[in-house]
Every structure is written in C-alpha cells, then in structure tokens.
Curated annotation (Swiss-Prot):
Cofactor(s) listed: FAD
Domain of life the protein comes from: Bacteria
Upper classification of the organism: Bacteria, Bacillati, Bacillota, Clostridia, Thermoanaerobacterales
Record protein name field: Methylenetetrahydrofolate--tRNA-(uracil-5-)-methyltransferase TrmFO
Originating gene: trmFO
Keyword Cytoplasm belongs to the record: yes
Annotated GO CC locations: cytosol
Length: 433
C-alpha cells in the first residue's frame, strides 16, 4: 500500500503531507498538539507561526520572494493559503496568523487521503517511509529515539520570539503609519529622539534576562538575534539594525527620527501589533518595564511576551542525501528547520521537496532539482556545507549557481537569476511534475 507517515504538522510537515496526498499517496499525519505543547506553540493548529507573522519579501529580486514563487510553481498549499490570508506589510508577505493556520488545518484535515493522528510519536520505524518534520522543538522522547538513526548528537542554537501588543493600548498621538522611502504605509512607527533612544538603550542592556542552563552555550542564529544581544554590541548597533530610521520621515517634523521602532499588524483589523525585530530573552517583568519606554507604548498591553527557546537541528551534510533522506536509512526523510534550513519559507520548501521525494519511493525518484533554483541551491547547501561546523542557513542568492557572466548591478543580477530559476524549474516540472 502507498502510505507515508509525516511526523509534525508545522509548516514543513503540512506541506509534505499536501505534496504526498496530491500525488495519490495516503498520509498519516501525526501532531502531538494539543495533548502536548512545545515551549513556543500556543494552539493546536497546523502551520502555526510561532515567531513573526511575515514570510519575507514578495519581489523576485528578493531570495525569499523567489523561493515563494518557486513554491507556487510546485502548487504549494501553504503558500497558497498565505497568499489568501495576506495582510498589508509593504513588500513582505505577512499573514493573519490565526486565519492562515486555521485554513491549513481545515484543508489537510478534510483531505480524503490524509488521516490526522493527534498523538506524540516517540518511536520511528525505519522500514516505513516517513517524513520527520518535528521541528527545532522536537520532543525529548522522539529526539532520543532518533539518535540511534543519526549516530551523532544534535546541534542547536537559540531562537527568540518578539512580543505582541494590543492596538487599542497604543498612544496613536505619538505614532504614525509609514513605509521606508514613502512606500506603502503599512508599518506603525514609534520615533525616538536621541534622549529617548539612550534612555531605552541603557534600560535594555542592563535588564534582567532569563538564565541559560549551566551546560548551554549562548549560541544564537545571527538572523534572529535577541534585541538585547544586538544592543550589547555597541550603543549605535540598534540604530543600524532593527531601529534604523533610514527612509522613514516623521510627518510632524518632516525629518528622519534619531531612531524608530516599527510595529507590524498581526491581523487585518489591526487589533494586535508585533514589535518588529524585538526578539528577546528578557524576563516578562523587564519587558513590561523596558518596552514601555518606547514612545506610544507607555501603557501597552502585552498580548504575548517575547520568549527564547532552544532550536535543535541535525548535521544534514553528514547524514542526508540530496533527497533529504538518511544515507543509512533511506526510508527516513527529514524536512523543516530540523534540517538546518532557517526560516519559514525554507521550512515550507524543504517540506515540499521531502514530500515530492518521498513519493518517489513508490515509483520513480524525481531528478535532482536544478542548482539554478533557490530551492535547489538550498538543498545543495544542506548536502555540501562543511560537516565540521555546519550552521543553519536562511535563503539568499549566494545559494544559487552564479550566472555565466558578471553583472555588477546587484538588483539586475538578482532579477536575471530569478528569471533563469523559474525557466529551469518549468523545464524540471515538465519532466518530473
């Protein structure tokens, strides 16, 4: 019987299940929530976005934008649902996280070839075709069981989540809507003068943090650093990072502020706002104190405080084939952030590829993806990165095979890389679709 187990119904597992089912393969989709939650999840919904509600850029000269377009070519359910539940966020694809997760859950739960099993998986059968998409917060029992197939210890880094505040608790007299360089006015901005910035900075770097366990090193993913860690690198680091004012004009002064905090809508109604770039490991008491120093947030009601959690991933270059299955146990596939592909869209993409590849176990395996595509480049990285110091990687144009000729203008170069990628993916689909 053509049947595959998918462990975990996050972004990667949801997409893998969809890709398998659309190819006529029965899926048993395991999800331990709501019986057991991870430190970051809050709902039993599939594809819950535990960090930001943004899936990154939409333009094709943006790496995440190109990868999303490739996924549309692959008929990605998760991207299709994201497009349908989009909320204004300038050049980014941000979604109403609840409507998004609810629709993914509904679509998969009602698919005739997908059986949803709400149980924690603690034991893997290497004889069954299985996609392991248990995420960077894989349960302790499953992680221990997987060790016998991985023959190595897990790697890890710390990831952090930004707080969310209630829109009605904000002082809109001190805030304004604007985008950078007078683009779409989709972000709410809290401008700071120098005095306000320095007061906030001093409070931030001296605030109490949740302690790490004695045996844990403070290894962070550079793409999602806690804001207090960024601040500790220098007084002006924030002003060139998440609080940079470049391109934002305060309508009350007609000038760029000294620094600016941006807030992004969490839903279409604007009931909730995410503090952009404010991933944090501060204690909740300190978040209340420090973040209320931001102009307009003096009486902010925190719907969710920022938290930090340990993310686990495997040494993919040592363990996986280009199809994301184990070299020694070829029926076991891996997908999502546990592979070391960092970020939402990389998780969806590796889920899509693992699902497509796993379907090949019942017939003919697909040809490897072209390395000229963003997805093909990401898979190549997961296969060929240095084994000794393997680190998670977010999508970027450095993953894609270079053009035959040099193009100095970066925007033009990325545009040509994107055009080539989609053309080559169309050719691949004509043979492997």
């Amino acid at each position: 019987m053509k049947e595959v187990d998918v462990v975990g119904a996050g972004l990667a597992g949801a997409e893998a299940a969809w890709q398998l089912a659309k190819r006529g393969i029965k899926v048993r989709l395991f999800e331990m929530r709501p019986k057991k939650f991870t430190p970051a999840h809050q709902t039993p919904l599939f594809a819950e976005l535990v960090c930001s509600n943004s899936l990154g850029g939409i333009n094709l000269d943006n790496a995440a934008g190109l990868l999303k377009e490739e996924l549309r070519f692959l008929d990605s359910l998760v991207i299709k649902v994201a497009d349908r539940n989009r909320i204004p966020a300038g050049n980014a694809l941000a979604v109403d996280r609840n409507l998004f997760a609810e629709e993914v859950t509904l679509r998969l739960s009602h698919h005739p070839l997908i059986e949803v099993i709400r149980e924690e998986v603690v034991d893997i059968n290497p004889e069954r075709v299985t996609v392991i998409a248990s995420g960077p917060l894989t349960s302790k029992a499953l992680a221990e069981n997987l060790k016998k197939y991985l023959e190595s210890d897990y790697l890890y880094f710390f990831d952090a989540v930004a707080p969310i505040v209630a829109g009605e608790s904000l002082d809109m007299e001190k805030l304004f809507f604007a985008g950078r360089y007078q683009q779409d006015k989709d972000y709410l901005n809290a401008p700071m003068n120098e005095e306000e910035y320095l007061r906030f900075y001093e409070a931030l770097i001296t605030a109490e943090r949740h302690p790490l366990k004695p045996f844990e090193k403070d290894i962070y993913y550079e793409g999602c650093l806690p804001i207090e860690v960024i601040a500790s690198r220098g007084k002006d680091t924030l002003r060139f990072g998440p609080l940079k004012p470049k391109g934002i004009i305060d309508p009350r002064t007609g000038k760029e502020p000294y620094a600016v905090v941006q807030l992004r809508r969490e839903n279409l109604a604007g009931d909730y706002y995410n503090l952009v770039g404010f991933q944090t490991n501060l204690t909740w008491k300190e978040q209340n104190r420090v973040f209320r120093l931001i102009p307009g947030l003096e009486n902010a009601e925190f719907i969710r405080f920022g938290v930090m959690h340990k993310n686990t991933f495997i040494n993919s270059p040592a363990l996986l084939t280009p199809y994301l299955n184990l070299k020694k146990y070829p029926r076991l596939f891996f997908a999502g952030q546990i592979t070391g592909g960092e970020g939402y869209v990389a998780a969806i993409a590796t889920g899509a590829w693992a699902g497509i590849a796993a379907s090949g176990m019942f017939g003919k395996m697909p040809e490897p993806l072209p390395e000229t595509t963003m997805l093909g480049g990401l898979i190549r990285y997961l296969n060929t990165a240095p084994v000794e110091n393997f680190q998670p990687m977010g999508v970027n144009f450095g993953l894609v095979k270079p053009l035959d000729r040099k193009i100095k203008n970066k925007k033009e170069r990325y545009k040509l890389l994107a055009e080539r990628s989609l053309k080559d993916l169309k050719r691949w689909l004509a043979v492997n679709g």
